[in-house]
From Swiss-Prot:
Belongs to the protein kinase superfamily. STE Ser/Thr protein kinase family. MAP kinase kinase subfamily. The modification Phosphoserine is found at residues 23, 222, 226, 293, 295, 306. Residues 288-309 are annotated as: Disordered. Interacts with MORG1. Interacts with SGK1. Interacts with KSR1. Interacts with KSR1 and BRAF; the interaction with KSR1 mediates KSR1-BRAF dimerization. Interacts with GLS. This is Dual specificity mitogen-activated protein kinase kinase 2. InterPro entries: Kinase-like_dom_sf (IPR011009), MAP_kinase_kinase (IPR050915), Prot_kinase_dom (IPR000719), Protein_kinase_ATP_BS (IPR017441), Ser/Thr_kinase_AS (IPR008271). The record marks 10-11 as: Cleavage. It comes from Canis lupus familiaris. It comes from the Eukaryota. Gene3D superfamilies: Phosphorylase Kinase, domain 1, Transferase(Phosphotransferase) domain 1. It is a peripheral membrane protein. The gene is MAP2K2. PROSITE patterns: PROTEIN_KINASE_ATP, PROTEIN_KINASE_DOM, PROTEIN_KINASE_ST.
């Protein structure tokens, strides 16, 4: 089970309301919570807009009360994965739109109660780079996890529309993912464990947030059999069953960045013909410093198990894929398409030995990140155009 200790600094949290009717001191308690919230906001390095948005979210959340199955009206399905279905719902008592993840588990009541208890840690995970949490409950054989609704969906969904995501956009994504991982590690001593495009959510305000991180060891254990797809983003050390740390999340981020850059899951690597089809021009062997001829063993016959590219080979079996991740050279970005800074950044994430792989601190000070932090990028505008969303009347140029 994932070990958790008390955060070094007080976690940013506001106590969820309990549906027992108003008490004489509820107004005073609410004001005390708000003062406490403002103090904790000051501890995080946020700009004014981020502070206002977090404060608004937590103030709304305090009015939600106890979550019950009968209080939700289903609007539409948002997606499925990790053993659950995510739907867009309206919480009738508050009028709030939420994303509700339903996970069906055949488990004993004691295990179920432990999962719900462990998920309560999410109430304390409040950051501009972490999807907001309203609460979790059990009903009719299913655990419900209610979260902030992100109208841009996940980056794997965005990729289907965009085909490829531009480097300057991925610069902003990289900043948000690194800051989200650093927040989870520094404030809560937890690692994500499941970084991949479908767990990076975006919205029309230009915000980029992580979801589905491993706060509940019992839930992870109970869902172990449904993690086959997720294993394709796991680091070599994790696939081999050895000790792993937040360095494993960095591998997963690097692999995700290559996928979002070329438009398909990058293992096995695309050959020159496929790269030419992807980028619309001839490529010389495609991958910098890693010609296919020096691969230690012949390239497996299968194509990626999923993706949006033009590879027509039969799908790669999962055991072939996992063997490839452990024993073959890591993926790289194609030469001549991306900046050297971005290529180096990804290469540092995808070093197979975790002791040599870059850590969060090194990556945050990398030239690619420093450049992306000062670059003016209209992330919200790009996303809204790509997904044909209505842009809010007061969008930000970047939310990171």
């Amino acid at each position: 089970m994932l070990a958790r200790r008390k955060p070094v600094l007080p976690a940013l949290t506001i106590n969820p309301a309990i549906a027992e009717g108003p008490s004489p001191t509820s107004e005073g308690a609410s004001e005390a919570n708000l003062v406490d919230l403002q103090k904790k906001l000051a501890e995080l390095e946020l700009d004014e807009q981020q502070k206002k948005r977090l404060e608004a979210f937590l103030t709304q959340k305090a009015k939600v009360g106890e979550l019950k199955d009968d209080d939700f009206e289903r609007i539409s399905e948002l997606g499925a994965g990790n053993g659950g279905v995510v739907t867009k719902v309206q919480h009738r008592p508050s009028g709030l739109i939420m994303a509700r993840k339903l996970i069906h588990l055949e488990i004993k009541p004691a295990i179920r109660n432990q999962i719900i208890r462990e998920l309560q840690v999410l109430h304390e995970c409040n950051s501009p780079y972490i999807v907001g949490f309203y609460g979790a409950f059990y009903s009719d054989g299913e655990i419900s996890i209610c979260m902030e609704h992100m109208d841009g969906g996940s980056l794997d969904q965005v990729l289907k529309e965009a085909k490829r995501i531009p480097e300057e956009i991925l610069g902003k994504v990289s900043i948000a993912v690194l800051r989200g991982l650093a927040y989870l590690r520094e404030k809560h001593q937890i690692m994500h464990r499941d970084v991949k495009p479908s767990n990076i959510l975006v919205n029309s305000r230009g915000e980029i947030k992580l979801c589905d991180f491993g706060v509940s060891g019992q839930l992870i254990d109970s869902m172990a059999n449904s993690f086959v797809g997720t294993r394709s983003y796991m680091s070599p050390e994790r696939l081999q069953g050895t000790h792993y740390s937040v360095q494993s999340d960095i591998w997963s981020m690097g692999l995700s960045l290559v996928e979002l850059s070329i438009g398909r899951y990058p293992i096995p690597p695309p050959d020159a013909k496929e790269l030419e089809a992807i980028f619309g021009r001839p490529m010389v062997d495609g991958i910098e410093g890693e010609p296919h001829s020096i691969s230690p063993r012949p390239r497996p016959p299968g194509r990626p198990i999923s993706g949006h590219g033009t590879d027509s080979r039969p799908a790669m079996a999962i055991f072939e894929l996992l063997d490839y991740i452990v024993n073959e050279p890591p993926p790289k970005l194609p030469n001549g398409v991306f900046t050297q800074d971005f290529q180096e950044f990804v290469n540092k994430c995808l070093i197979k030995n975790p002791a040599e792989r870059a850590d969060l601190k090194m990556l945050m000070s990398h030239t690619f990140i420093k450049r992306s932090e000062v670059e003016e990028v209209d992330f919200a505008g790009w996303l809204c155009k790509t997904l044909r969303l209505n842009q809010p009347s007061t969008p930000t140029r970047t939310a990171v």
